[in-house]
Amino acid sequence: MDYLVDILHRSKKPIIEGFFIETLEGLIFDVKGLLHPPDRIIAYVRYIPNTKGDRVSRRGIRYRKIYSLLDREKFLEKKYPYYIYYDPIFGRRLQGVPLGSIRYIYDPIERLKELMYSESLDPLEKAAVELVEEVAERAGISRSTIGITGSILVGLHSSTSDIDLVVYGEKEGISVYRALLDMSKERVKIRPYNEEELERLFIFRSRDTFIPLDTFLKIERKKILQGIFKGREYFIRLVKRPEEFGEKYGDRRYKPIGRVRLRAIVSDTRDSIFTPCRYILDKVKVISGHAPKPIKEVVSYRGRFREQARKGDTVIVEGVVELVENEESYCRVLVGEYPRDILIPEEV
């Protein structure tokens, strides 16, 4: 299992969005973002060993999946509080795994390589490889920039699991997005969610993101980084390489100020397809709350906020306003941390 990299012998490849890590206790975390402190990886617990769990690893260990962010934090607070820490750069409590507590690193690119050379794939793994081949060919990119993440990466998928892919590189991500746009219009290999599928997705998402059903349907049916391939749900993350991100851990400091609700016009959506995603704002009008500096952008580390608005849209945003401190201080709004957080085009 080459995709399982022993922490003591791992390469110098950066551990970023799309990777999973397993702790000494057997907890499995999914890595968040591209900025991490030198002594730990910012990651959120996803699978926990449980004798009654409905997922079984290749090593025969039963696991249970934790879904909502609130449930993940409650579990760690009760059982493993040392995986919650205060981060001085992000100015808040985060989940994170110290390097010394990591047993394995699950590498999405290595996992794909393993699947591509395997002669004994299950139906879901086979469909995942076929989707990779289709996307890579249509986008004209190397398969070496694509990885398998999610439950397939850690070997805890079931027959009904979805296909989670990650594409690394800004240029590669844009090429994949354009290819998916063409493929989605053709509706031959992939198709968008239908109404029934979107309603099921709404029930799942509403566990920790609350927006009206009719609004949800209007927004989600336009998205192409998610959909159906050969009867299976897919979800594709586009992730910039660390050197393309334009920021290293500690370059800026983020100070949460409080909640804010605002109306603004989206002036730039170039980063709206990536994870983390970002929307540049113009003509910001604060409806409630306070920001000590001009609010320039809205950011999210959650995939569900990608493709949420288009350039020129007037949007309603509610989330945590943060003071971004570097050479030029400004404010941004972070969405996705709390169920009340929203980023909704006013026209829908």
Question: PLM ranges: what are they?
Answer:
Residues 1-160, 168-348:
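Catalytic core of pol beta-like nucleotidyltransferases
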